[in-house]
Amino acid sequence: MAKASTSGASRVRKKVKKNVSDGIAHVHASFNNTIITITDRQGNALSWATSGGAGFKGSRKSTPFAAQVAAETAGRVALEYGIKTLEVRIKGPGPGRESSVRALNALGIKISSIADITPVPHNGCRPPKRRRI
């Protein structure tokens, strides 16, 4: 008969909160959604939020207001880690580009720089066909 072990299985590791003063906010603004990830300088994620995760579904996910709400959500969690300054890197052509940066600024986080890192093809893949309405 196997003996039930009492040590080891019941121990739960306490999550350690890092104290980070500056970090990087990665904003991925696609046409359908906006994803905001706040990392430390090494690239370890501290917090993240999406427009869909903020409660918006369908075409409302792709609005600037949805990106603003998502940025506020990610920013509040990052403030608990002690974030004071952020370097913002924006990727994508979506409508949530500017409003997400404004929302982070309104939380009291100092934005040191804004960089557009949208990948531009050197005539790579064929783009989607034009919409006809």
Swiss-Prot record:
GO terms for cellular component: ribonucleoprotein complex; ribosome. GO terms for molecular function: rRNA binding; structural constituent of ribosome. Pfam families: Ribosomal_S11. GO terms for biological process: translation. InterPro entries: Ribosomal_uS11 (IPR001971), Ribosomal_uS11_bac-type (IPR019981), Ribosomal_uS11_CS (IPR018102), Ribosomal_uS11_sf (IPR036967). Keywords: Ribonucleoprotein, Ribosomal protein, RNA-binding, rRNA-binding. Transmembrane segments: none annotated. Belongs to the universal ribosomal protein uS11 family. Part of the 30S ribosomal subunit. Interacts with proteins S7 and S18. Binds to IF-3. HAMAP family: Ribosomal_uS11. Located on the platform of the 30S subunit, it bridges several disparate RNA helices of the 16S rRNA. Forms part of the Shine-Dalgarno cleft in the 70S ribosome. This is Small ribosomal subunit protein uS11. The lineage of its organism: Bacteria, Pseudomonadati, Pseudomonadota, Betaproteobacteria, Burkholderiales. The gene is rpsK.
